[in-house]
């Protein structure tokens, strides 16, 4: 009798868990693999009673799925977020009840420059199709966005960020993918924030890549872990040490993107380890463009004081980094091409750009152009606390063009990064 009772209690507990998680599958997202010309990673979660652990995929023109292929995911029980203090959409404090099966699948052998659809499920039950596009086109474009701090009690934050992506889509209806520069959640330890965010349409339509922001790394009560962003995604496992799946690199076409985690670079030892890895990646992976991404700003937008620029500029000069992207400061800052601390004609040097916030809530106000580093900084932009902006990035063999757009699609700033490598 006791055994029967214990079994019933266990079944009830699992059923209650399944009821508290979203309907399976959840937190579905397409992520880059190391070479996005022929390989894409898919990440999702299912409750412990679900068998939706496969992904099927085919070219977007094959709407009947007649030529679909299927991949069984690698799975494990994920408890990363379970029991962490959080907030309900109604603003009530509770502990995340998030024990689920994490699924990761790599779709390989893909055709370059091709639109694909994919869905999650098993047997005859499959989710609605989602989309991604492989790289390989001579010309491509992306939406760059940052700092919308998803927080379910204040859904207008994500609404503003997603509306900004729609604005970029209107500016360029053929964008290929989305890159974020961190702080896309208020607390990365709140799995409910990730699952709600990834239900939004832009996560259905594009491959997403991104870096770990300080908010993505934290919990409501100031816990810290890089596992939060790692387990909400499936990034390439080509980083270093404990940063596998958090720090990573990938190709989109002939551009090499290198993704860093500022939270492990606060001390000199962590910075040295990250820089040794970046040097190795650049030396072993040739590309027309080298683009390094991190969350913390290169310069402080309100006064122009150097932040991360001084820690990285010598290495970027040495390695020939073309573009350095960041977020965090909530103020747009863009420099001239810089080499050896001085502006150049663009034939050498790195352009440093940090994105504005996009949640219509957490922007900053500045009165004048920065008083420091005026010889380096070429543009700043803000809308005060209610700032919303994003960047359209266009690439071809001759140059990268970055265009800052406001929420209405107006061009606020534009810069060109010349190709310096064949």
Which residues fall in each region the model found?
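An acidic-aromatic substrate-binding cleft motif
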Residues: 100, 125-181, 187
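Acidic/histidine-rich helix-loop elements
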Residues: 62-98, 142-162, 231-238, 266-270, ...
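Extended active-site neighborhood of metal-dependent phosphoesterases/phosphodiesterases
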Residues: 101, 106, 115-131, 192-279, ...
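Loop/turn elements at helix/coil->beta-strand transitions in domains of secreted/extracellular proteins
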Residues: 138-141, 173-178, 203-209, 245, ...
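Active-site-proximal segments of metal-dependent phosphoesterases and phosphodiesterases across multiple
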Residues: 156, 264, 270, 285-324, ...
């Amino acid at each position: 009798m006791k055994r029967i009772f214990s079994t019933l209690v266990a079944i009830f507990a699992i059923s209650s868990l399944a009821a508290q998680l979203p309907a399976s599958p959840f937190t579905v997202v397409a992520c880059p693999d190391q070479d996005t010309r022929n390989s894409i990673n898919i990440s999702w979660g299912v409750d412990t009673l679900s068998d939706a652990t496969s992904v099927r995929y085919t070219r977007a023109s094959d709407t009947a799925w007649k030529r679909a292929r299927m991949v069984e995911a690698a799975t494990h029980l994920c408890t990363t977020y379970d029991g962490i203090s959080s907030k309900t959409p109604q603003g009530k404090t509770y502990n995340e009840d998030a024990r689920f099966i994490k699924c990761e699948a790599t779709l390989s052998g893909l055709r370059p420059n091709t639109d694909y659809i994919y869905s999650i499920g098993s047997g005859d039950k499959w989710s609605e199709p989602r989309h991604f596009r492989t790289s390989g086109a001579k010309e491509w474009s992306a939406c760059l966005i940052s700092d919308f701090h998803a927080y379910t009690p204040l859904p207008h934050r994500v609404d503003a960020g997603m509306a900004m992506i729609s604005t970029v889509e209107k500016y360029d209806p053929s964008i290929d993918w989305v890159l974020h520069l961190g702080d896309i959640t208020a607390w990365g330890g709140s799995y409910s924030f990730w699952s709600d965010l990834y239900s939004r349409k832009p996560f259905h339509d594009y491959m997403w890549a991104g870096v770990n922001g300080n908010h993505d790394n934290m919990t409501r009560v100031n816990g810290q872990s890089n596992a939060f962003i790692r387990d909400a995604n499936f990034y390439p496992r080509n980083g270093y040490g404990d940063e596998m799946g958090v720090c990573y690199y990938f190709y989109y076409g002939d551009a090499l993107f290198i993704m860093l985690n500022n939270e492990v670079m606060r001390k000199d030892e962590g910075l040295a380890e990250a820089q040794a890895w970046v040097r190795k990646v650049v030396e072993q992976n040739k590309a027309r463009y080298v683009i390094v991404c991190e969350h913390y700003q290169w310069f402080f937008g309100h006064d122009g004081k150097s932040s991360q620029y001084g820690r990285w500029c010598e290495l970027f000069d040495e390695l020939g980094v073309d573009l350095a992207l960041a977020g965090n400061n909530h103020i747009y800052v863009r420099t001239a091409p810089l080499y050896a601390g001085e502006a150049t004609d663009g034939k050498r040097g790195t352009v440093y750009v940090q994105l504005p916030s996009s949640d219509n809530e957490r922007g900053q106000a500045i009165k004048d152009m920065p008083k420091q580093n005026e010889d380096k900084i070429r543009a700043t932009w803000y809308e005060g606390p209610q700032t919303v902006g994003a960047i359209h990035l266009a690439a071809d063999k001759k140059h990268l063009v970055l265009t800052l757009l406001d929420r209405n699609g107006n061009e606020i700033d534009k810069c060109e990064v010349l190709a310096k490598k064949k």
